[in-house]
Amino acid sequence: MITLTQKDLLKAGVHLGHLSRKWNPSMAPFIFMESRGIHIIDLNKTLSQLQEAADTLQAVARSGKKILFVATKKQAKELVAQTAKSLNMPYMTERWLGGTLTNFITIRRLIKKLTSMERMMKSATYKNMAKKEQLMIARDKDKLERVLGGVLDLTKLPGALVVVDIMKESIAVQEARKLGIPIIALADTNVDPDLVDYPIPSNDDATPAIELIVRTLGEAINEGLSMRQEDKAAEAQDKDAQDTEDNKGARPRGAEKVAYSDADSEEDNAYGIAVKASKNKTAEPVERFKKSRTPVKGSRPIGVSKAGDKPKK
């Protein structure tokens, strides 16, 4: 649950929209009034939309999926990068590479190339190269790192996208829409809020306004991550309890179950005669015979094959 008030939003300038002549009619439900040629955003709508977006991001973080932050405008890139780093989430703040989402396999190849270049620059082979070759490799590595440095740990498509400016990040929005990835974005009075899933009516140009909204969304994500840790701890505890319960009813290894026939008398069972249980729950006693000292009539002594033959030596 967010704790922001209208006063907090007013102080940050969230309510200030664009010139009324530059408005997008789709933003009409979120506009409170027009003052001196400027549209004023309805902060009640901002709070309700912000709460919905925060709940969504909290659920995504709790599920274990990554949330990609996108902000390439000058006044937003630094604070967005810091927020994403603090949450261990991916971000793109320099330039959106076309196909980052729709051609994710190619982006992964570039990330692997960057990782390989970083390893090579630490090896003896790099040190033995000519200065010109070293400079070329370092320049290519820096270029890739500037663009892809924030998504090195993104091994699969993100669970959600957080966008600061819908118009400036239009390519990222299009790719996410094509793949069905939920989009949370600040929506100023000059944009189409229908392009994203969770528009937050807000000034997307003033740094204090951007910082306030992004920080609030970051807090929701952090809560989701904490819930995920609690869920894991509870699952581990339940598993240990179940294992303990299963071990209580288990027989020691090597122990055999001994059954007694219902047909046997109590006297027979008292002697400890073991029985084999059959499928129909009846049992036959297994008697233990001792060697007889008196030869059985008609039997041959051990070693004699036939009557009259001599015993074998």
Swiss-Prot record:
| Ranges of compositional bias, category Basic and acidic residues | 228-256
Give me any GO biological process, just one. translation
InterPro entries noted in UniProt = Ribosomal_uS2, Ribosomal_uS2_bac/mit/plastid, Ribosomal_uS2_CS, Ribosomal_uS2_flav_dom_sf
Source organism: Amoebophilus asiaticus (strain 5a2)
Gene from which this protein is expressed: rpsB
Q: Which UniProt keywords apply?
A: Ribonucleoprotein, Ribosomal protein
**NADP is among the record's keywords:** no
Q: Where is this region: Disordered?
A: 228-313
Instruction: Give the Gene Ontology MF terms in alphabetical order.
Output: structural constituent of ribosome
Provide the family line.
Answer: Belongs to the universal ribosomal protein uS2 family.
An example of a Gene Ontology cellular component annotation for this protein is:
cytosolic small ribosomal subunit
Looking up SUPFAM superfamilies in the UniProt record yields: Ribosomal protein S2 (SSF52313)
Looking up PROSITE patterns in the UniProt record yields:
RIBOSOMAL_S2_2
Q: Name one Pfam family in it.
A: Ribosomal_S2
Q: Name the domain of life.
A: Bacteria
Q: What is this protein called?
A: Small ribosomal subunit protein uS2
Q: Which HAMAP family match?
A: Ribosomal_uS2_B (MF_00291_B)
